[in-house]
From Swiss-Prot:
Keywords: GTPase activation, Nucleus, Phosphoprotein. It comes from the Eukaryota. Its main location: nucleus. GO terms for biological process: positive regulation of GTPase activity; signal transduction. This is Rho GTPase-activating protein 11A. Pfam families: RhoGAP (PF00620).
Length: 987
């Protein structure tokens, strides 16, 4: 059967859950055991001695019972019909004589009177060192008696199962005897309630016998009698564990019903040394908890499952996240877990029990064909980076210990925090790596939010420990990984995927991005065309004069990137395919030679690109300038552009700043473009599409939105592209409509991409030279903002120290309040007269958001212009007139002092002094300077204006105003100076 402590745990759980009874555990049995071992030295005595030191007799149905109890009950059974048995007390003298004889070992009970024997029996229980019913169960037994009749019996019997086995045997024997007495109640007048009242003080041993009776004591005696009466009525079931408790133990441990009894070798010697009882009991409870957790973690696998089968099962289907089947821990370590290990087990357990469909190996297949359908090929497999930005990095140290023991050799794939298992190339499970790299699938199709991807960019950038080493590893290993070789072997084409380039970019186009530019159901025809070296359109395309590659890289997801080679490469035999899929070293050398050849033909410098790609993260502004979207347009007919590559206007460079909205959104993502590898050199014969187009826009606009004017502008060229590319795919020899701008969408494209296409079309008609317009201020602001997301930026050491919070002096605050009140109290006529001449020194902000001064007058409008204009318009007009483009983001909270004769004048001499002392600060009433830097404002004194204006501007305060000021701490503000809050302040 189950171990006693497992049964005890199940009983305690049942009592707490069903009846609300909590048992104070555990030390009572150890204390009793210690007393019992100490009492073994006492020999010969019967009264006042623990049970284990008494001589025992074996009773067939009940086990080992003390001999005195057996003899006394046997003697009383002969006189069971005696009226008032146990109620009538015997002679005290005879009781003492009988007691002394029994202690000396004489057998005198057979000749004694029944009342004397009954008195001896009560005295025997009363003089025990500890009560028969354990003291730590008294409160629980009392609570059980306050339940209903049915529940009271069940709870009392469950509590009796918590007692030690010798005690249970004695209680069962004695209460069966009392039950037989109560069954003769018609003769002896002693039913179970009467017997309970008599034996309750003896069995429960209350020490309150000499105290006065009170309501409390009476209630306690009643509860004690109810406990004994329940035991008498249910005597045959005392200590018997119900079957439903035993059935709960496997479910509690997470063991299958068919499983054999779990081995409990660690529990065998616990009671051998009573001094260590407390420590071992605490250990055993931890063992039960850990055993239950381990069984639950192993997905309810039977505990007799061999360890080898389990590890083989776990390693046969390698998953991206932790598998649902854990390896079994060794037997010697399964019973001693530290608290830290328990916490980690609980964390993993909660992580596995999440109801996600991609955590289980049953719902997510190991191998899924990506190219079967272009739309729904990888709906069920999402990248772990897309799911959680920093979970894998945070749990990698803990998981690596389990990975090391699983004998699965892993090769680094360049993905942040994820390792792909190294499987032999002959297995078809290699194709499941496409699902890991399928970052192009938008989660909007599942109804999930895309906003988390923007947050994950910063998290993942912050988790990258060494940016340069990651770039180098991606450069050297990604395009030559076995995934590419498998793909080349399977497809038989020179198509090299760009998926590894975009491993670190979570943003994609919308859900149907896997579709090719033309409307075929799959990309097989394009593969055949690229594999066929004699295709007519391929013969017409020379180095850097074909336009299909940028269209495809802009249009579709980065996963299924199809790249075309020039005709010189296609004229080689098909052995080049085998060499690409063969040795990695040969592939690297061939590719390097082709890169150098292509760059030498195009006249560009390879080393410049390489050095530029290895630049630091902080050079993102130059990175954006360098990676302008280069769009190649082969406008010549057939091969006419082959010789005049340098002269024909086939390349247009436009920076992202040509559309400010595009630049604003793209620059926020330009950290992820740093992770673009230089393995775009494999596409060396083709101009590179700007990665910002591929990354910065995950397709947030709905697909059904009406076309903007930019979309409508680009519609005719889209039709030409569709016609040209479909004709090229079918191999039409007379094809000459190859004019392509950026991309061809088979569905309405996002608005920003259409803007890019129209911008490129406008670039064709502007000038043959390359257009580059950059706004360094906006780009640098975005870069600085984005750098705050990165923990590894080089400027971390230059972070400003925390702001010192300075409390504004009381005197200064009072001055501000009084100046506001003083200004509000001026007559309206006086204010209107001043408005034509001078601006008030007290500026009221237009809104809480902008905090722009509203009373700054534009000099170009003359003195009669209305003063209350919006602060933003005044600021724009003054900056345009003075030709100063020095506006920063901080100029919206405190306006710079531009050389304005009206704003240069101040109202009162007192305020004039205050301004001169503070180096040109405009003092706003109640302005909080706590968390703002003190800016040095630019004051230009070169503007000449007439002295008459100077004389008009300065206003002398009246006598009333001087009298009103009582703002110092010595002269507090009078009651008359405080305005009610409901009264508006006149401007």
């Amino acid at each position: 059967m189950w171990d006693q402590r497992l049964v005890r745990l199940a009983l305690l759980q049942q009592l707490r859950a069903v009846y609300g009874i909590k048992v104070k555990g555990g030390r009572g049995q150890c204390d009793r055991r210690r007393h019992e071992t100490a009492a073994t030295e006492i020999k010969g005595k019967v009264f006042g001695v623990p049970f284990n030191s008494l001589p025992h007799s074996v009773v067939p149905e009940f086990g080992h019972i003390p001999s005195f109890l057996v003899d006394a009950c046997a003697s009383l059974k002969e006189h069971i019909h005696t009226e008032g048995l146990f109620r009538k007390s015997g002679s005290v003298v005879r009781l003492k004589a009988l007691k002394s004889k029994l202690d000396q070992g004489e057998a005198c009970l057979s000749s004694a009177l029944p009342c004397d024997v009954a008195g001896l029996l009560k005295q025997f229980f009363r003089e025990l060192p500890e009560p028969v019913l354990p003291a730590d169960l008294h409160e629980a037994l009392f609570k059980a008696q306050q339940l209903g009749a049915e529940e009271r019996n069940k709870a009392t019997l469950l509590l009796s199962c918590l007692m030690a086995n010798p005690t249970v045997d004695i209680l069962r024997y004695f209460f069966n005897f009392l039950k037989s007495v109560s069954l003769r109640a018609s003769e002896n007048k002693m039913d179970s309630s009467n017997l309970a009242v008599i034996f309750a003080p003896n069995l429960l041993q209350t020490s309150e016998g000499h105290e006065k009776m009170s309501a409390n004591t009476e209630k306690k005696l009643r509860l004690q009698a109810a406990v004994v009466q329940t035991f008498i009525d249910c005597a045959s079931d005392i200590g018997r564990v119900p079957d439903f408790i035993l059935e709960k133990i496997p479910a509690m441990l997470g063991i299958d019903g068919l499983c054999t009894t779990p081995s409990l070798e660690g529990f065998e010697g616990d009671f051998e040394t009573p001094g260590e009882c407390k420590r071992k009991r605490r250990q055993s409870v931890g063992d039960f908890v850990n055993g239950a957790l381990n069984k639950l973690k192993s997905s309810r696998t039977p505990s007799i499952t061999p360890q080898q089968d389990r590890t083989a099962q776990a390693s046969a289907s390698p998953l991206i996240l932790t598998p649902s089947v854990k390896r079994k821990l060794p037997g010697e370590s399964s019973h001693a877990f530290s608290s830290k290990k328990r916490k980690s087990i609980k964390h993993n357990l909660n992580f596995e029990l999440l109801p996600s469909h991609f955590f289980s190996s049953n719902s997510t297949p190991v191998s899924v064909h990506l190219d079967t359908s272009p739309d729904g090929s990888s709906q069920t497999s999402l990248s772990p980076i897309a799911m959680s930005g920093n979970h894998l990095v945070s749990t990698e140290l803990r998981r690596s210990k389990r990975i090391a023991s699983k004998k699965v050799y892993r090769v680094e794939s360049g993905k942040a925090g994820c390792f792909s298992p190294k499987v032999s190339r002959k297995e078809k499970t290699r194709r499941s790596l496409r699902l890991k790299f399928s970052l192009g699938k938008n989660r909007d199709s599942d109804g999930c939010s895309v906003i988390n991807r923007y947050e994950n960019v910063g998290r993942r950038l912050a988790n990258q420990q060494n940016l340069k080493s990651r770039i180098d590893s991606v450069k050297t290993g990604l395009l030559f990984s076995p995934d590419i070789d498998e793909r080349l072997l399977k497809k038989g084409s020179e198509k090299i995927s760009k998926s590894e380039e975009h491993l670190l970019t979570p943003d994609q186009l919308d859900g149907t991005g896997y579709r090719m530019s033309w409307t075929e159901p799959s990309n097989s025809s394009f593969q055949d065309m690229s594999a066929n070296g004699t295709s007519p359109i391929m013969q017409n395309l020379e180095v850097k004069s074909f336009s299909l590659e940028p269209d495809i890289t802009v249009e579709k997801s980065p996963v299924v990137s199809c790249e075309l080679r020039p005709s010189t490469f296609h004229s080689q035999p098909d052995s080049s395919v085998l060499s690409l899929s063969g040795d990695e070293g040969n592939l690297a050398s061939e590719t390097l030679q082709k890169i150098q050849k292509a760059f030498s033909e195009s006249g560009s410098d390879l080393h410049m690109v390489i050095n530029h790609e290895q630049s630091s993260v902080t050079n993102t502004g130059e990175e954006v300038e360098f990676r302008d979207v280069t769009v190649t347009e082969s406008k010549g007919h057939d091969g006419s552009c082959a010789g005049e590559e340098e002269n024909c206007p086939s390349e247009r460079n436009f920076s992202p700043d040509q559309s400010p909205e595009f630049a604003r959104e793209a620059d926020e993502e330009c950290y992820s473009t740093q992770m673009k590898v230089e393995c775009e050199g494999l596409h060396s014969e083709t101009p590179k599409a700007d990665p910002l187009i591929l990354q910065a826009f995950p397709g947030e606009e709905p697909a059904e939105e009406p076309q903007s004017p930019r979309n409508q502008l680009s519609t005719p060229s889209r039709g030409n592209e569709n016609g040209g590319e479909s004709a090229g795919a079918s191999g039409a020899p007379g094809e000459d409509e190859s004019t392509c701008s950026v991309a061809v969408l088979s569905k309405p494209r996002p608005q920003r991409l259409s803007r890019q296409q129209s911008l490129v079309e406008k670039c064709d008609s502007v000038a043959p030279g390359a257009l580059q317009v950059t706004e360094h201020g906006k780009v640098s602001d975005h870069i600085q903002w984005f750098n705050k997301l990165s923990l590894n930026e080089p400027n971390r050491g230059k972070v400003k120290s925390p702001l010192k919070f300075q409390r504004t002096p009381v005197r200064q605050s009072v001055r501000r309040i009084n100046s506001l009140l003083e200004y509000g109290r001026q007559p309206v006529r006086q204010k209107l007269a001043i408005f034509g001449d001078a601006a008030s020194p007290l500026v009221k902000s237009v809104s809480c958001d902008s905090a722009l001064p509203s009373c700054v007058q534009n000099t170009s409008k003359g003195p009669t212009a209305p003063l209350i204009t919006s602060g933003l318009e005044a600021q724009k007009s003054t900056s345009c007139n003075k030709s100063s483009v020095e506006l920063t983001s901080k100029s919206f909270t405190k306006m710079k002092r531009h050389p304005d004769p009206l704003s240069a004048s101040l109202g009162t001499p007192r305020l004039c002094k205050q301004e001169n002392k503070s180096n040109g600060h405009i003092k706003f009433p109640l302005d909080d300077l706590t968390n703002h830097e003190r800016l040095k404002f630019v004051v230009n004194n070169n503007v000449a204006f007439s002295p008459g204006m100077k004389n008009r501007v300065v206003r002398k305060p009246s006598e009333k105003e001087r009298v009103w000021y009582k703002g110092s701490p010595k002269n507090p503000i009078g009651k008359t100076q405080l305005l009610p809050t409901s009264k508006p302040v006149d401007l």
